Amino acid sequence: MQDKWDKRFTRVAQEISAWSKDPSKQIGAVAVNDDRRILATGYNGFPKGIEDIPERYEDRSIKYDLVVHAEMNCIYNATFNGISLKDATLYVFGLPVCHDCAKGIIQVGINKIVMSMDDIPQKWLDSFEKSRRMFDEANVDVHFLNGTNH
């Protein structure tokens, strides 16, 4: 039964990812409580009030200085709205959780992550391995959908 819900919320994260204006990669995140209620969503993009024009996405040095990852955007949106993510599940579509986002996920008390991606790109392997070690130590359950088994 849970697998059905994991797939549903992963599809929601995929839909949210389409809101990103990043032409190279769209990532989506959805935080859900035990009652299967959506608490917050996020996608990779610039902070509120920062103009997200195409030229800024084309210049990687500018883009990487400005972009907020989907996972942290989801956490910030929950915080902005006064919503606790303690014991929530975070569904992430598009890329694995990086080690910087892992810190935030652990800090707010998210206890399960479901990730969906075709494969983990080589350039993200080191960061994901750091995330995995942190999640293991902090007792955060990590699951994969779409046939990924990392």
Where are these regions (language model features)?
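Zinc-dependent deaminase catalytic domain
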Residues: 1-150
